Amino acid sequence: MARPLKLRWALAGLAGLTLLRLALAAWLPLSPDEAYYWVWSRALAPGYLDHPPMVAYWIWIGTHLLGETALGVRLLGPLAAAGGSLLLGQAAEDFWPGKGAGPIAAALLNATLLFGAGSVIMTP
């Protein structure tokens, strides 16, 4: 019974962290690089001068869902971070079954500064 409770707490923590990241994504002004990539999203191409197109595609999706706002530009960053945390947690559980490694692996990933900043700022 203790393991499902730990998993629920881990998922609740991840949901709260994702909501915090979405709030920060909406509140922080866009960086010059993000504005540059937003321009890319207005004319999608299979590639750009110095980067592959994924950031432009993600910004295009976000701005079509939420409009041309800071949150629209950054929407998929925090959502992808949550998805990546879930995938890493499942991989850790598969690698070390029965040891509760999934929530620990996801927590360690989310504790890194670069992952936290990179999940809010939409740059490649």
Model-derived regions: residue spans:
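Membrane-helix interface segments
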Residues: 6, 69-71, 95-104
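Transmembrane signal-anchor helices characteristic of membrane glycosylation enzymes that use polyprenol
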Residues: 6-30
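Transmembrane-helix motifs of polytopic, lipid-linked glycan transferases
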Residues: 11, 75-96, 111
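Short acidic/glycine- and proline-prone juxtamembrane loop motifs at membrane-interface regions
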Residues: 120-124
